């Protein structure tokens, strides 16, 4: 149960942060956001704000999306002769077009629609008491569709494709950008929780309670200078010296550790402890505890995580295998394991997954943010927009590829995790 809760929390935070980036910068760029959705499939919860954006929580934890005006099949069609009820504002502009038999306004004006333009001229024409009349439509008017769903009209100036290149570019990049920011923030938080960043350049050590070094008298922040005569000036030196000193070591044998404590040099016999096939002496790298050190430590962890992910991506390109990929099932399995290991493991997983999601979404596949960014760049270079039909076909092909890949990855994860 703890694993499921952890998975839902991590998944929810990653998706909300990613989609909020798209949502925020779409709004800033003047694009009408139709829907902000968390998850896929049937709606569990929905709410419409005053700006006409529908917020939904959906059943399947397979991602999320921000649906913008002008994307896909976004136009509302009103057939000639359709009965409608018009609600006018104080200026005489239509503020609501009701095509349903629900949400009726007793003050509304009945009309049989004969023509309309809700994108450019913003007008609606029809028969009112057997007389043809045309009314201006307010820029933020809404339509109540036949099923009772109320949505805002989308004039050309609030549609995605009519926003500036810069606006569309930052809107598409904002999702991955938010994931990178989240990853960095969580890694910094992790370093603060741990008390600092390990200092691998130093030979000062932290001593593990009841470990071999503690039993021999070493204390936190003591400085190990030699092990069995091997000089130690850094953490790497220390691990190499332990490895060399414990080769062919007998069960009851000890090694000589020379260390400096309170400016005094001491040499003690330490009996290493064997874990699997390696020996340890119960010490860890000392921590850099300054505020600046912690901030830089978080950035260092984020960069290291990104570098690891990029190397894995490179390996995937040179030698593709489904076993190198993971979907929601693998994410659940990792969340479950992290939950068993405590808060720090959960935060570390969240940070890595967030950076991973950011990098993955920048891959220039049409269905991903990277594909949209690539089309924005091509449009900027050509100085003319890509045809909507062409962009739609390219995106559809990308979606098909991603759906097939997701099914294959999920099936592979199920077989690997549960069987």
Curated annotation (Swiss-Prot):
SUPFAM superfamilies: PDZ domain-like (SSF50156). InterPro entries: PDZ_6, PDZ_sf, Pept_M50_Zn, Peptidase_M50. One of its GO terms (cellular component) is plasma membrane. GO terms for molecular function: metal ion binding; metalloendopeptidase activity. Residues 175-274 form the PDZ domain. The keyword Zinc applies. Pfam families: PDZ_6, Peptidase_M50. Zn(2+) binds at residues 18, 22. Its cofactor is Zn(2+). Its EC number is 3.4.24.-. This is Putative zinc metalloprotease M6_Spy1682. The lineage of its organism: Bacteria, Bacillati, Bacillota, Bacilli, Lactobacillales.
